Protein backbone atom coordinates (compact mmCIF):
# COMPACT_ATOMS: atom_id res chain seq x y z
CA UNK A 1 0.00 0.00 0.00
CA UNK A 2 0.90 3.68 -0.12
CA UNK A 3 0.36 6.18 2.71
CA UNK A 4 0.79 9.93 2.78
CA UNK A 5 3.42 11.68 4.85
CA UNK A 6 0.76 13.21 7.06
CA UNK A 7 -1.00 12.64 10.38
CA UNK A 8 -3.42 10.11 8.92
CA UNK A 9 -0.59 8.15 7.32
CA UNK A 10 1.36 8.21 10.59
CA UNK A 11 -1.73 7.01 12.46
CA UNK A 12 -2.28 4.10 10.08
CA UNK A 13 1.40 3.17 10.18
CA UNK A 14 1.39 3.10 13.98
CA UNK A 15 -1.87 1.14 14.10
CA UNK A 16 -0.57 -1.51 11.71
CA UNK A 17 2.70 -1.77 13.61
CA UNK A 18 0.77 -2.31 16.84
CA UNK A 19 -1.01 -5.22 15.17
CA UNK A 20 2.32 -6.68 13.99
CA UNK A 21 1.69 -6.10 10.28
CA UNK A 22 4.79 -6.28 8.08
CA UNK A 23 5.25 -2.79 6.60
CA UNK A 24 8.53 -3.45 4.81
CA UNK A 25 6.93 -2.94 1.38
CA UNK A 26 4.61 -0.08 2.35
CA UNK A 27 5.33 3.12 0.43
CA UNK A 28 5.03 6.76 1.56
CA UNK A 29 4.37 9.86 -0.54
CA UNK A 30 3.82 13.58 -0.01
CA UNK A 31 0.26 13.25 -1.35
CA UNK A 32 -2.34 13.17 1.43
CA UNK A 33 -3.47 9.78 2.76
CA UNK A 34 -6.64 8.50 1.10
CA UNK A 35 -9.67 8.91 3.36
CA UNK A 36 -12.89 6.90 3.55
CA UNK A 37 -15.79 8.54 5.37
CA UNK A 38 -18.18 5.89 6.69
CA UNK A 39 -21.80 6.49 7.70
CA UNK A 40 -23.71 3.79 9.61
CA UNK A 41 -27.50 3.31 9.68
CA UNK A 42 -29.60 1.84 12.49
CA UNK A 43 -28.99 -1.74 11.26
CA UNK A 44 -25.22 -1.31 11.28
CA UNK A 45 -25.05 -1.14 7.47
CA UNK A 46 -22.56 1.39 6.15
CA UNK A 47 -22.06 3.73 3.24
CA UNK A 48 -18.80 5.20 1.98
CA UNK A 49 -17.56 8.52 0.62
CA UNK A 50 -13.92 8.64 -0.49
CA UNK A 51 -11.31 11.38 -0.73
CA UNK A 52 -8.64 9.76 -2.86
CA UNK A 53 -4.99 10.57 -2.36
CA UNK A 54 -1.83 8.55 -1.74
CA UNK A 55 -3.18 5.08 -2.56
CA UNK A 56 -3.26 5.84 -6.29
CA UNK A 57 0.50 6.43 -6.28
CA UNK A 58 1.53 2.88 -5.37
CA UNK A 59 4.55 2.12 -7.54
CA UNK A 60 5.16 -1.30 -9.11
CA UNK A 61 8.27 -3.06 -7.80
CA UNK A 62 9.55 -5.66 -10.26
CA UNK A 63 12.20 -6.91 -7.84
CA UNK A 64 9.68 -8.48 -5.43
CA UNK A 65 7.91 -10.91 -7.74
CA UNK A 66 10.01 -13.78 -6.38
CA UNK A 67 8.08 -13.32 -3.12
CA UNK A 68 4.96 -14.55 -4.95
CA UNK A 69 6.51 -17.93 -5.83
CA UNK A 70 3.90 -20.57 -4.90
CA UNK A 71 2.51 -18.19 -2.28
CA UNK A 72 -0.88 -16.51 -1.88
CA UNK A 73 -1.63 -13.15 -3.53
CA UNK A 74 -4.85 -11.30 -2.71
CA UNK A 75 -6.23 -8.42 -4.77
CA UNK A 76 -8.82 -6.47 -2.77
CA UNK A 77 -8.34 -2.70 -3.12
CA UNK A 78 -11.56 -0.72 -3.61
CA UNK A 79 -9.72 1.97 -5.59
CA UNK A 80 -7.57 -0.31 -7.74
CA UNK A 81 -9.32 0.34 -11.07
CA UNK A 82 -9.50 4.14 -10.86
CA UNK A 83 -6.34 4.85 -12.81
CA UNK A 84 -2.93 6.05 -11.74
CA UNK A 85 0.11 4.05 -10.75
CA UNK A 86 -1.99 1.78 -8.52
CA UNK A 87 -4.01 0.39 -11.42
CA UNK A 88 -0.87 -0.18 -13.46
CA UNK A 89 0.77 -1.92 -10.50
CA UNK A 90 -2.32 -4.08 -10.01
CA UNK A 91 -2.03 -5.42 -13.54
CA UNK A 92 1.70 -6.04 -13.23
CA UNK A 93 1.27 -7.89 -9.94
CA UNK A 94 -1.47 -10.09 -11.42
CA UNK A 95 0.95 -11.10 -14.18
CA UNK A 96 3.70 -11.73 -11.62
CA UNK A 97 1.37 -13.88 -9.52
CA UNK A 98 0.47 -15.95 -12.58
CA UNK A 99 4.06 -16.47 -13.65
CA UNK A 100 5.09 -17.40 -10.10
CA UNK A 101 2.36 -20.08 -9.72
CA UNK A 102 0.72 -18.22 -6.84
CA UNK A 103 -2.73 -18.92 -5.42
CA UNK A 104 -4.70 -15.84 -6.51
CA UNK A 105 -7.63 -14.41 -4.58
CA UNK A 106 -9.83 -11.51 -5.77
CA UNK A 107 -12.35 -9.27 -4.00
CA UNK A 108 -13.57 -6.44 -6.28
CA UNK A 109 -14.73 -4.26 -3.36
CA UNK A 110 -17.23 -2.30 -5.45
CA UNK A 111 -18.13 1.08 -3.97
CA UNK A 112 -21.01 3.01 -5.55
CA UNK A 113 -19.51 6.38 -4.60
CA UNK A 114 -16.40 5.62 -6.64
CA UNK A 115 -18.16 4.49 -9.81
CA UNK A 116 -21.57 6.24 -9.81
CA UNK A 117 -22.77 5.96 -13.45
CA UNK A 118 -19.70 4.11 -14.74
CA UNK A 119 -20.32 0.55 -13.54
CA UNK A 120 -19.71 -0.86 -17.03
CA UNK A 121 -16.06 0.23 -16.85
CA UNK A 122 -15.72 -1.37 -13.42
CA UNK A 123 -17.11 -4.66 -14.76
CA UNK A 124 -14.72 -4.65 -17.72
CA UNK A 125 -11.70 -4.05 -15.49
CA UNK A 126 -12.69 -6.88 -13.13
CA UNK A 127 -12.91 -9.52 -15.86
CA UNK A 128 -9.19 -10.43 -16.11
CA UNK A 129 -9.01 -10.88 -12.34
CA UNK A 130 -12.11 -13.10 -12.27
CA UNK A 131 -10.67 -15.14 -15.14
CA UNK A 132 -7.27 -15.70 -13.51
CA UNK A 133 -8.16 -16.02 -9.81
CA UNK A 134 -8.50 -19.32 -7.97
CA UNK A 135 -10.87 -17.80 -5.40
CA UNK A 136 -13.29 -14.89 -5.84
CA UNK A 137 -15.18 -13.29 -2.97
CA UNK A 138 -18.22 -11.19 -3.88
CA UNK A 139 -21.02 -9.43 -2.05
CA UNK A 140 -24.54 -10.08 -3.37
CA UNK A 141 -24.48 -6.68 -5.09
CA UNK A 142 -21.15 -7.43 -6.77
CA UNK A 143 -22.19 -10.90 -7.94
CA UNK A 144 -25.35 -9.53 -9.56
CA UNK A 145 -23.53 -6.55 -11.08
CA UNK A 146 -20.66 -8.56 -12.57
CA UNK A 147 -22.83 -11.40 -13.88
CA UNK A 148 -25.87 -9.41 -15.02
CA UNK A 149 -28.09 -11.92 -13.20
CA UNK A 150 -30.51 -11.30 -10.34
CA UNK A 151 -30.54 -14.85 -8.97
CA UNK A 152 -27.34 -15.83 -7.20
CA UNK A 153 -27.15 -19.38 -8.55
CA UNK A 154 -27.41 -18.04 -12.09
CA UNK A 155 -24.82 -15.41 -11.21
CA UNK A 156 -22.44 -18.14 -10.05
CA UNK A 157 -22.87 -20.00 -13.33
CA UNK A 158 -21.88 -16.90 -15.29
CA UNK A 159 -18.94 -16.12 -13.00
CA UNK A 160 -17.66 -19.69 -13.28
CA UNK A 161 -17.87 -19.39 -17.06
CA UNK A 162 -15.70 -16.28 -16.76
CA UNK A 163 -13.06 -18.42 -15.07
CA UNK A 164 -13.47 -18.42 -11.28
CA UNK A 165 -13.23 -22.00 -9.88
CA UNK A 166 -14.23 -21.11 -6.29
CA UNK A 167 -16.78 -18.39 -5.54
CA UNK A 168 -17.86 -17.14 -2.12
CA UNK A 169 -20.82 -14.75 -2.07
CA UNK A 170 -21.26 -13.17 1.35
CA UNK A 171 -24.90 -12.51 2.27
CA UNK A 172 -24.71 -10.90 5.69
CA UNK A 173 -26.86 -12.59 8.31
CA UNK A 174 -27.83 -15.32 5.79
CA UNK A 175 -24.27 -16.59 5.59
CA UNK A 176 -22.21 -17.33 2.49
CA UNK A 177 -23.02 -19.09 -0.77
CA UNK A 178 -20.04 -21.26 -1.73
CA UNK A 179 -19.96 -22.32 -5.35
CA UNK A 180 -17.75 -24.45 -7.57
CA UNK A 181 -18.67 -25.55 -11.10
CA UNK A 182 -19.91 -28.85 -9.66
CA UNK A 183 -21.54 -27.82 -6.38
CA UNK A 184 -23.28 -25.00 -4.51
CA UNK A 185 -23.98 -24.75 -0.80
CA UNK A 186 -25.16 -22.00 1.54
CA UNK A 187 -23.10 -21.92 4.75
CA UNK A 188 -25.00 -20.37 7.65
CA UNK A 189 -23.55 -17.54 9.68
CA UNK A 190 -23.50 -16.90 13.43
CA UNK A 191 -26.46 -14.90 14.76
CA UNK A 192 -25.32 -11.57 16.19
CA UNK A 193 -26.70 -8.09 16.82
CA UNK A 194 -24.66 -5.90 14.42
CA UNK A 195 -23.68 -2.34 15.27
CA UNK A 196 -21.15 -1.68 12.47
CA UNK A 197 -20.62 -3.87 9.40
CA UNK A 198 -17.47 -2.00 8.32
CA UNK A 199 -14.72 -4.51 7.60
CA UNK A 200 -16.90 -7.62 7.91
CA UNK A 201 -16.17 -8.74 4.35
CA UNK A 202 -12.46 -8.10 4.79
CA UNK A 203 -12.48 -10.05 8.06
CA UNK A 204 -14.25 -12.92 6.29
CA UNK A 205 -11.77 -13.16 3.43
CA UNK A 206 -8.84 -12.60 5.79
CA UNK A 207 -9.93 -15.53 7.95
CA UNK A 208 -10.54 -17.75 4.93
CA UNK A 209 -7.15 -16.96 3.38
CA UNK A 210 -5.42 -17.46 6.72
CA UNK A 211 -6.88 -20.96 6.92
CA UNK A 212 -5.99 -21.71 3.31
CA UNK A 213 -2.39 -20.62 3.94
CA UNK A 214 -2.04 -23.39 6.54
CA UNK A 215 -3.03 -26.25 4.22
CA UNK A 216 -0.54 -29.08 3.81
CA UNK A 217 -1.40 -29.41 0.11
CA UNK A 218 -1.57 -26.94 -2.77
CA UNK A 219 -4.54 -24.58 -2.25
CA UNK A 220 -5.18 -24.76 -5.98
CA UNK A 221 -6.62 -28.23 -5.24
CA UNK A 222 -9.09 -26.84 -2.67
CA UNK A 223 -12.07 -26.92 -5.05
CA UNK A 224 -11.94 -30.73 -4.89
CA UNK A 225 -11.98 -30.74 -1.06
CA UNK A 226 -15.50 -29.41 -0.54
CA UNK A 227 -16.10 -30.50 3.06
CA UNK A 228 -12.87 -28.83 4.12
CA UNK A 229 -13.77 -25.69 2.16
CA UNK A 230 -17.22 -25.54 3.79
CA UNK A 231 -15.70 -25.84 7.26
CA UNK A 232 -13.27 -23.03 6.47
CA UNK A 233 -16.09 -20.80 5.26
CA UNK A 234 -18.13 -21.55 8.39
CA UNK A 235 -15.25 -20.30 10.53
CA UNK A 236 -14.76 -17.26 8.31
CA UNK A 237 -18.49 -16.52 8.64
CA UNK A 238 -18.10 -16.47 12.40
CA UNK A 239 -15.15 -14.08 12.19
CA UNK A 240 -17.07 -11.75 9.88
CA UNK A 241 -20.14 -11.83 12.11
CA UNK A 242 -18.22 -11.10 15.31
CA UNK A 243 -16.52 -8.16 13.59
CA UNK A 244 -19.92 -6.48 13.20
CA UNK A 245 -20.59 -6.48 16.96
CA UNK A 246 -18.09 -3.69 17.62
CA UNK A 247 -17.40 -0.32 16.04
CA UNK A 248 -14.43 0.02 13.73
CA UNK A 249 -12.65 -2.48 11.50
CA UNK A 250 -9.24 -3.59 12.75
CA UNK A 251 -10.07 -3.33 16.45
CA UNK A 252 -13.25 -5.35 15.94
CA UNK A 253 -11.57 -8.41 14.40
CA UNK A 254 -11.62 -11.29 16.93
CA UNK A 255 -8.44 -13.06 17.99
CA UNK A 256 -7.71 -16.42 16.38
CA UNK A 257 -8.48 -18.29 19.59
Question: What are the language-model segments listed below?
Answer:
Residues 74-75, 138, 169:
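Redox-cofactor binding/interface segments in oxidoreductases and associated redox assembly factors
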Residues 63-64, 126, 194:
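Acidic, amphipathic alpha-helical patches
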Amino acid sequence: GCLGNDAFGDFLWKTLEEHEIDLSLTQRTDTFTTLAFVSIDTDGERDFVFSRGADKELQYQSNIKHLFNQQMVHFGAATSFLGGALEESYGHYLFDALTQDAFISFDPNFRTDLWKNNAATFIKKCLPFIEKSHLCKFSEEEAKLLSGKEHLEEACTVLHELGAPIICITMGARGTLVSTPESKKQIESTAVIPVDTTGAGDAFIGSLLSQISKLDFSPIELSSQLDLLYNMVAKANKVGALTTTKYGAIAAIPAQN
